[in-house]
A protein has these predicted regions:
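Glycine-rich phosphate-binding/hydrolytic loop that grips phosphoryl groups
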Residues: 483-505, 509-511, 550-559, 686, ...
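Internal gly/pro-rich beta-alpha loop/helix module
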Residues: 62, 162, 316, 320-395, ...
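Conserved phosphate-binding catalytic cores of ATP/NTP-utilizing and phosphoryl-transfer enzymes
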Residues: 256-261, 310, 336-343, 367-368, ...
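Intrinsically disordered, low-complexity, mixed-charge
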Residues: 1-175, 179-182
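Short glycine-rich phosphate-binding loop at a beta-alpha junction
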Residues: 212, 450-462, 703-714
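A phosphate-binding glycine/aspartate-rich beta-alpha loop in the early core of alpha/beta enzymes
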Residues: 76, 218-281
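Conserved phosphate-binding/catalytic loops in two-lobed NTP-binding clefts
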Residues: 459, 474-486, 707-711, 718, ...
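A contiguous, well-structured pocket-lining segment that forms one wall/lid of small-molecule binding clefts
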Residues: 160, 175, 182-184, 406-444, ...
Length: 759
């Protein structure tokens, strides 16, 4: 007879871990206890050496599906004899905290939901140890019902019996509930509740109405994705003329009908996180054009909450569409609504009916958006199902840091030692409501993770709201340059701490020289960077308008490339009028609302304008995306199909310059010659990749650094990503890219937290 104390660290709370341990131990004839300690699960296992060994083997090799084991330690324990194996009350201990994300409804709960003989028949909140809300309802750790919003709903006797019975799937399931216990769904401003409310919602959808639906992490706005007039009306109400809308399809069969996808995408669609996955549309699909206009892809997710399943499958005699638009329930720029008060104040004007429920949401959680690249996940927005799973590094860092993140697509990051907890998506910080949401989320996550940051890190921009927030925290503050933070985020995700050649391409960021950066090649390590190369600067004229109207950038670059004949060329190609050219030239010369820029994002906008694809954008990245889609229509091998340009790079004051004026000039010549726009779009991508790779090779030869890191929102363009990566690898360089941390500003906070301040 031996007794061992076993501690298991990782995602072991909220995933049915203690019931799993109890069942395994009992089956092996072991006695003892298992308890949550907040930062780990502690097991006392008493029995034969063989049985204890088999339990440890089960913990290591076949833990519950949703668990993530990071470390197991064990030691001999002197304990009196135990009579049985029990789950005992949780106790708080100091240490690393691992919080489970929200988990999509499992297959067993799906079956029970529609089983008329089951007491949870049609219960919109059915869950078990393998599924249900976690992060969004959690008030503090350890994860027990009394520390969640489910404390508002005392268990009925039947639920309590299952909760305490090791033989059931709901043994120790903290959010366990049923139709007796609550919560319940209802239509705001109506007497309709429960099944009646769901039927009324379905009827409204089929009548072409727009509905607000409260889910796990906040509200969605939804309508029939096959109803063109309903989708157009939703766009008008949200002032969202062209940005793609996500759709929720009833099941994988509906997804196959609408889209082409492979095994990797199917695993993402059907996995327990249930993100929105970007898929190629089929021409034979039935989704209306307004869902994702002029876009070959559409964001698709499958139902992940029981309420979603009821909307599609509740057999109440109402014929229901199998395709719903599901877009975030928020005012443009504001955070997603999470309460009835939010919904009534902010989105009631966008919808005809609000289907809500009385389970409180403590932490907002938007849907995660996922793409794929080279057979692996390539995340665009990291939120529900993934946050706040920590990014682990082997650096052995000490202390705690709060990183505030970027101004756009904001997330924040809490570092505890070598664990980096990247938050759910917060939003764009221009709106004061989003700043308030950031403040609330930081406070709650610090409490949840028992974090007491010793310092704070933020961006360098003097006018960002995130910077003002960081400066008001009364903590030692360090400001990290935006594009350097991008590269650091890629290094952190890949657990790489040595020097890299970082290619950081995005739309904007405040440079150390006070100009706009965005097309940077940096020599980086964790302690600092050197600007080795960049896009050749151009004038960005018109303030905020210049980030939306690519013709302005095209005019400036073409004018620089052609000199005195620039105005004539621009007018001939329809880039701008003679009057507009003269006005912009004067503004640039006198530096009126004009600033020097090296933005790769604006370069893409300029190329799109020159080719007559998009002169302006109604949402971030619209013109650049249209350029990418045009290029992807031209299917050729990326190497050796164009006559090389005379000069791809130059040097000025020790900095390599990518000759983008020559690149825009090439596009202008192509348009004058009547060449195919798709071919020219592809050539733009190819030549920019050539320039980038050539610059990296030169830097590598000079410094001996053989590793490159690619980050920044422009690398969401998978065509450019593939071209640059392939060229660098052909040169013998190792390339680090993102996977489960966004390349865009949603990953900035991780990079800020990874910065090693040696002061």
């Amino acid at each position: 007879m031996k007794t061992e104390m076993i501690r298991v660290y990782g995602i072991v709370q909220g995933v049915g871990f203690r019931p799993f341990v109890s069942r395994e131990a009992s089956d092996l004839g072991l006695c003892g206890t298992v308890a949550n300690k907040g930062s780990y699960v502690e097991i006392h296992a008493q029995g034969s050496e063989k049985a204890v060994g088999e339990l440890k083997n089960a913990l290591e090799n076949r833990p519950p599906e949703r668990a993530m084991i990071m470390e197991i330690i064990s030691a001999h324990a002197d304990e009196p004899p135990f009579d049985s194996f029990e789950i005992i009350d949780s106790e708080k201990e100091k240490g690393d905290i691992f919080v489970s994300p929200d988990i999509a409804v499992c297959e067993k709960c799906k079956v029970e939901l529609f089983d008329k003989t089951n007491r949870r028949y049609l219960h919109p909140f059915i869950n078990c140890t393998q599924c249900g809300p976690r992060l969004t309802i959690m008030d503090s750790m350890p994860y027990d019902r009394v520390r969640t919003t489910m404390a508002d709903f005392p268990m009925c006797k039947d639920c309590e019996r299952e909760y305490t019975d090791p033989a059931t799937r709901r043994y120790d399931a903290q959010p366990v509930c049923c139709n007796k216990c609550g919560p319940e769904v209802y239509i705001i401003g109506s007497e309709k509740k429960g099944a009646e409310a769901i039927t009324a919602t379905k009827e409204a959808v089929m009548a072409g109405k727009i509905i607000a639906v409260k889910g796990i992490g906040g509200f969605h706005l939804c309508c029939d994705a096959k109803n063109e007039s309903a989708v157009k009306r939703l766009r008008e109400l949200k002032n969202r003329p062209a940005k793609p809308l996500a759709v929720m399809l009833k099941d994988i069969s509906a997804a196959r009908r609408e889209c082409d996808f492979g095994e990797v995408q199917e695993k993402l669609l059907t996995g327990w996180q249930k993100p929105i996955v970007l898929l190629d549309k089929k021409t034979s699909g039935s989704l209306c054009k307004s869902v994702a206009p002029d876009n070959p892809t559409v964001g698709v997710m499958l139902p992940y909450a029981p309420l979603h399943l009821l909307l599609f499958d509740y057999d109440d005699g109402v014929e229901m569409t199998d395709s719903l638009v599901m877009t975030s329930g928020n005012v443009r720029g504001a955070p997603i609504c999470r309460s009835d008060e939010d919904a009534l104040c902010e989105i009631a004007g966008f919808c005809d009916l609000i289907l809500s429920h009385n389970r409180r949401i403590l932490i907002r959680s938007d849907d995660t958006v996922m793409d794929t690249f080279e057979g692996k996940p390539y995340i665009i927005r990291r939120s529900r199902g993934y946050a706040p799973l920590p990014i682990m590094t082997s650096c052995g860092d000490k202390g705690q840091t709060l990183a505030i993140g970027g101004e756009l697509k904001n997330t924040f990051c809490i570092r505890k030692g070598s664990l980096y907890y990247l938050s759910s998506y917060v939003g764009d910080m221009a709106d004061i409501r989003t700043v308030k949401a950031l403040e609330e989320s930081v406070k709650r996550m610090c409490e949840l993770l028992e974090a007491t940051p010793q310092n704070v890190v933020c961006d360098m921009h003097p006018k960002y709201n995130t910077v003002a927030f960081a400066e008001g925290l009364d903590l030692p503050l360090k400001k990290v340059q935006h594009h350097y933070a991008h590269i650091l985020s890629c290094m952190a995700e890949n657990d790489y701490s040595e020097k890299v050649i970082g290619v950081s391409y995005d739309g904007t960021g405040f440079g150390t020289d006070g100009t706009i950066w965005g097309g940077e090649i940096l020599l980086c390590d964790r302690t600092g960077f050197e600007r080795m190369g960049s896009i050749k600067p151009f004038m960005q004229v018109g303030g905020d308008l210049s980030s939306k109207e690519g013709w302005r950038i095209a005019t400036m670059i073409a004018g620089s490339a052609y000199g005195e004949s620039g105005g004539e060329i621009c007018e001939k190609l329809g880039i701008c009028t003679a009057k507009e050219y003269k006005l912009l030239s004067i503004m640039a010369e006198k530096k009126v609302n004009a600033v020097s820029s090296t933005s790769a994002g604006r370069l893409f906008d300029a190329a799109s304008a020159v080719l007559g694809i998009r002169r302006f954008s109604t949402f971030e990245g619209e013109a650049s995306m249209a350029l990418q889609f045009a290029a992807e229509k031209f299917s050729r091998e990326p190497f050796g199909i164009y006559e090389p340009m005379e000069k791809l790079t130059a040097e000025k004051e020790g900095r390599i310059m990518l000759c983008t004026q020559a690149l825009i000039k090439r596009l202008c010549q192509g348009m004058q010659n009547g060449e195919d726009k798709n071919r020219l779009s592809y050539e733009f991508h190819s030549l920019l990749a050539d320039m980038t790779a050539q610059a990296c090779r030169t830097i590598s030869e000079r410094t001996g650094v053989k590793v490159c890191a690619l980050s920044g929102g422009v690398f969401q363009n998978k065509l450019l990503l593939k071209m640059v990566k392939c060229r660098l690898e052909k040169m013998g360089l190792r390339v680090l890219i993102h996977s489960l941390v966004p390349a865009n500003d949603g990953g900035i906070a991780l990079g800020q937290a990874f910065y090693l301040n040696e002061e």
